[in-house]
Amino acid sequence: LHPRVRRQRQMCIRDRTKRGQIGKPRIQIKADYGFSAPTMLPEFVDGAKYMEVMNVASQFSSGKDMYTQAAINATRNGTDPDLYPNVNWLKAVTKDYVPSGRVSLDINGGSERLRYSLILAYYGEKGMTVTDPGVEYDASNKLSRYNIRTNLDMNLTPSTEINVSLGGYILNQRTPGYTTSSDENPRTPFTDIIKLAFKNTPIVHPVIYSNGQIPANTSQTNPWAAATHSGFISSYISSLQSVFAVTQDIGKLWHPLKGLKAKATFSFDTYAWNSFLRTKKQTTYMATGRDADGNLLTSVTNEGDDYLKYSKEAGGNRTMYMEGQLSYSRLLADAHQIDGLLLYNMRDYVDADATSAINSLPHRTQGIAARLSYSYKGRYFIEGNFGYNGSENFSKGHKWGFFPSVAGGWLVTNEKFMESTASVLSKLKIRGSYGLVGNDQLSGRRFAFLSTITSGTGYVYGTSGNQTINGRFEGDFGIEDLSWETVKKTDIGIEIGLWDCINIQADYFHEKREDIFMQRKTIPETAGFNKNPWANFGIVKNQGFDASLEMNKSFGKDFFLSLRGNFTFSRNKILEYDESEAMKQTTRARTGNPLNTYYGLKAVGLFQEEDFKADGTLVDGIPNHTFEQVKPGDIRYEDTNHDGKVDTYDYQPIGRPSVPEIVYGFGFSARWKSFDFSAFFQGSTNVSNMIQGDMLIPGSGGGGLGNIYANCDDRWDPNDPYRQ
């Protein structure tokens, strides 16, 4: 564990870009081209099937059909798509695939006194939403990004080196104007448009009427119009990163201190964004029929705008970081490698998007860290680290946290008794580490040791009761003894190399997070808190394993092949949560379950005719479902607490957590002479997503929303209630 990452947030400079190398200028040009396509879109029924299924549901609830057979036939035959539409909204608003491309130029070279590296890159991609060629403005979804990075390394003297790294990018993103996500900066409407496509039924209206008018009812937006006729949002993002460092090799100035270096680093980063919103509401219509001549009759449902409206949004942040360090590295007697590091750092961050006076204040942290490592003849390794970090969020006496760690390793293949296996087993290393990591960030809360005072409506007075006196009251309650959240990390790993071309790495990891920041849940209202106070309360365990496999092999002098893959499994469990002992004994308990778990009722089957008495009530022994009156074919839920009724007290964990437990990837790279080709695939599993409301339930939103999934023929049928 590196001493600079004692804190669970970025606190240091990690410059991993290419540095200049001594030699003549080397120029490398690389181009990539790819495609993106949705791979797991749900399948919905078409319009006619939708009407038939809704008729079945309506018969159960009211004994009547919602749609006539003539309307169903007209929808299926497509004889009049204006009055009897049949639309697959997902296909109507998305493309089958979209292209993306990347081009980069890398120039590298230099001398012993000055080395340089320059990287220029462009990346562009098209978005998935469709456009209407008849629209006069550009409402397409697309992105362009331009990057530049330059590194200069200069030796002022034989013992003094200066490093300068400057980089940045400019990103231009254009999207349709429709958006409901006002909390995103900048906004990304694609998700909002896809949600509309999920909600709108295939029969609500066509994509566009034959007379060119845009259809929409009074309560829901036309997904196609949202993608093509809502104006556009043009966003610009710019970022600049700069790092300046001076390194002095003290050992070259005074030989007794050989191996000792001093380094000072300063960085300044800025991020800024602005969006121009040229949005427009389109006048929409709904068809009411046809006149005697067959012309389409429509009525206005929403009055639109005659022009594109204009508004703008902007924001950004800046970060200043300083670091000073002393490092020591020396090999003694050709056997004992000793390395040491001592550093101090400080960080100042200002959020230009701050929404309150408190959050507009600079975020400041500082700390010291140290590392000492020893290795013997490249076989045995041991290392110790510590970080001592201060935080603005805690009171005096609790601001500083101490986070030590230790690591060790054994490179078995460097032992003499392993020399006979070198042709096959090129590397075998066993390693392990244990350490403590700290976190000082509370979600949405700064200076947690201070109470906040806010204002609001006080009391009403006057003969008519329309006079008020505003007052002030306590908001967040300050907690003096709040301190660092800590994580104990253990890692045991092995590295294997075979035939100098195959590398295998496997790690088991275990983490125990303690003193987790959370707002107390079990404090009674009689305590008088306006907001539940924060506390170091909570324990979560996380464990799993990580593995990777890589093969690099040359076939002759012209062909090179690389194969690689990785797999990670991680599962967590809440060991302590602020809930009563009585709650812990129920299925609703958070304790004992993973983070990000969904809770709900567990379906145990469907109600059948024999579950009901003649008067329609449930037979004895079947729990009463309190949400609504149930009928044959309705879902039957488990009464987990065995109190004879099904209600919110019967909630239990359902599905998987919302964060994947398994992440994997695999790919390859091939090079023949001066040409190379690579591909990489990645995925995740053991994860659940909750789809509910208008996204799931047909007939919701007053009956006009909610699609029906294509597997609806699996539904309960009174004529065959027990089919599988």
Language model regions located:
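Short strand-turn segments of transmembrane beta-barrel domains in outer membranes
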Residues: 24-49, 77-106, 120, 128, ...
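Extracellular/periplasmic, surface-exposed regions of secreted and cell-surface proteins
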Residues: 151-159, 165-170, 179, 191-197, ...
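Outer-membrane beta-barrel transmembrane strand signature
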Residues: 70-108, 117-121, 206-251, 340, ...
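Transmembrane beta-barrel wall of Gram-negative outer-membrane proteins
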Residues: 91-173
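Single conserved hydrophobic/aromatic residue that forms the stacking wall/gate
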Residues: 2-9, 13
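Non-catalytic regulatory/gating segments with a bias toward low-complexity or hydrophobic composition
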Residues: 14-15, 244
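Glycine-rich phosphate/pyrophosphate-binding loops
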Residues: 115, 380, 672-692, 699
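Conserved small-residue
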Residues: 28-79, 178-179, 185, 554-658, ...
